[in-house]
Regions:
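Conserved N-terminal catalytic core of the sugar/cofactor nucleotidyltransferase
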Residues: 2-4, 30-120, 463
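Conserved core of the sugar-phosphate nucleotidyltransferase
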Residues: 57, 110-193, 200, 211
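Conserved alpha/beta core of the MobA/IspD/sugar-nucleotide pyrophosphorylase nucleotidyltransferase superfamily
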Residues: 167-270
Length: 470
């Protein structure tokens, strides 16, 4: 059966107090709307039809860029005359049969299992509503049942005292037979105080047509919470992060404090992984067995092999090229690994060392205050404190090659393109502009001069000019 998904995302989000469309505000590093679209794509939807309005062009451009493979379609609601009017805009894009699932673009945590169950409850024949049991249902429409059958949705302001005791609330999401949906939408009226077309009016139409109205319950309130303000967004972020932390810990990951953990992408972990507090993981991150992540690290798009230790305050950002850290490597504290860094087994990168677009073979070390850019570093190289590769000539980047067992003294500059042969030694303070032969000692610095009896200049103190009175 064909499944189309319609996502309402036209609202301005006034309470967000932001120029950005509400559905583009991020939860766990991805726009709210993207969470919903990704879930819909996971269901195998035939079409993902997003109804846009405020900031439509930005919303559409962003989603097409972020989800290039998804079966996206966009329709615009201009002006915005209610939820029923919104779904009416999707009618030309909908098929003639099957099921249409209607979701909200600012409700990002609906699980694929829940949406699948909702569509199954519809079965192309029934009107299925997604409901939830609430501790405080204030503001929600109540689900009034006659036995198991849904009889009506009663808004909070219209509910009787008895109906207000009902804890089952309507989430605003439903699954509808597509052919019936088109017919009911065509008959919507706006004879109400707001002069708007309400999607919920199709419930009465279904009952009048003898179509069964059923309900499927969400697993938790968190799953169906929407976002209308920065406070609600922050609260939902913490709920979502707590859920992700729980999943990881149930899989054996040791989080020292799950309340101080942020995952803004996808994280896969081997056995006996330990993660200290205030760490942020973005993009796609893989941690091998026995990896230890110290406090206050930020790691994005990286693969960290078994036994590696990432000390506190380390920043690893692979961007599009990624970063790889080999087995047993020691990184940090206060290290920075940038896109294209490929570190072999047992490599040491110490405090205030930056590595970009460079490979370092097994056992190479750069322990203090150094920069390696566009470099190939061989096994067991020792790269001294304060040393840098001068890889950029103002227009192009150039390669530095440091072969195995080279010792680079402190405060050296290697001006690329240049090759340091295997086993060579570079004296501290040298500026190397030519290739160095294997096994050679190369020293390129100004000669030290001593001046006997030299005295430092003394500061000249200006005399203050005085004024005489008369």
């Amino acid at each position: 059966m064909v499944l189309d998904i319609v996502i309402m995302a036209a609202g301005k989000g006034t309470r967000m107090k932001s120029a950005r469309p509400k559905v583009l505000h991020a939860l766990a590093g991805r726009p709210l709307l993207q969470h919903v679209l990704e879930m819909g794509a996971a269901l195998g939807a035939h079409r993902l039809i997003t109804i846009t309005g405020h900031g439509a062009e930005l919303v559409e451009t962003t989603m097409r860029a972020n989800l290039p493979e998804a079966p996206l379609a966009f329709v615009r609601q201009e002006p915005q005359l209610g939820t029923g009017h919104a779904v009416q805009q999707a009618v030309p894009v909908l098929g003639d049969s099957g099921t249409t699932l209607i979701l909200n673009g600012d409700v990002p945590l609906v699980r694929a299992e829940t949406a699948r169950a909702l569509a199954a409850a519809c079965g192309g024949e029934k009107l299925a509503l997604l409901t939830v049991d609430l501790l405080d249902p204030s503001g929600y429409g109540r689900i009034v049942r006659n036995g198991e059958a849904v009889q009506a949705i009663v808004e909070h302001k219209d509910a009787t005292p008895e109906q207000r005791q009902i804890r089952e609330g309507y989430t605003g999401m439903m699954a509808v037979p597509t052919a019936a949906l088109k017919r009911w939408l065509a008959n919507l009226k706006n004879d109400n105080a707001q002069k708007e077309y309400y999607l919920t009016d199709i419930v009465a139409m279904a009952v009048a047509d003898g179509v069964a109205v059923v309900a499927t319950k969400a697993s938790s309130e968190t799953e169906v919470l929407g976002v209308n303000s920065p406070l609600q967004l922050a609260q939902l972020e913490r709920r979502f992060q707590a859920q992700q932390a729980e999943v990881l810990m149930e899989a054996g990951v040791r989080l020292l404090d799950p309340a101080r953990f942020d995952l803004r992408g996808r994280l896969s972990c081997g056995r006996d992984v330990a993660i200290d507090v205030n760490c942020v993981f973005e993009g796609s991150v893989e941690l091998g067995d026995d990896v230890s992540i110290g406090a206050n690290c930020v790691i994005r798009n990286a693969k960290i092999a078994a036994g590696a230790v990432i000390h506190p305050f380390t920043h690893i950002d692979g961007e599009a090229l990624g970063v790889e850290v080999g087995e047993g490597a020691l990184i940090g504290p206060f290290a920075r690994l940038r896109p294209g860094a490929r570190l072999g087994a047992e490599v040491h990168i110490g405090n205030f060392v930056e590595v970009k677009n460079s490979t370092m073979a097994k056992g190479a070390k750069a322990n203090h205050l150094a920069y390696l850019g566009d470099a190939v570093v061989g096994e067991r190289v020792n790269y001294g404190a304060g040393s840098i590769t001068a890889n950029y000539d103002g227009a192009n980047k150039h390669r530095t090659t440091i072969e195995a067992d080279v010792h680079i003294g402190s405060n050296c500059v290697l001006v690329a393109p240049v090759t340091i042969g295997a086993g060579a030694t570079i004296g501290g303070g040298s500026t190397i502009t030519k290739n160095v032969a294997p096994g050679h000692l190369s020293v390129a610095r100004g000669r030290q001069t001593g001046i006997e009896g030299w005295a430092r200049p003394q500061k000249v103190v200006a005399k203050k000019s005085g004024k005489t009175g008369g």
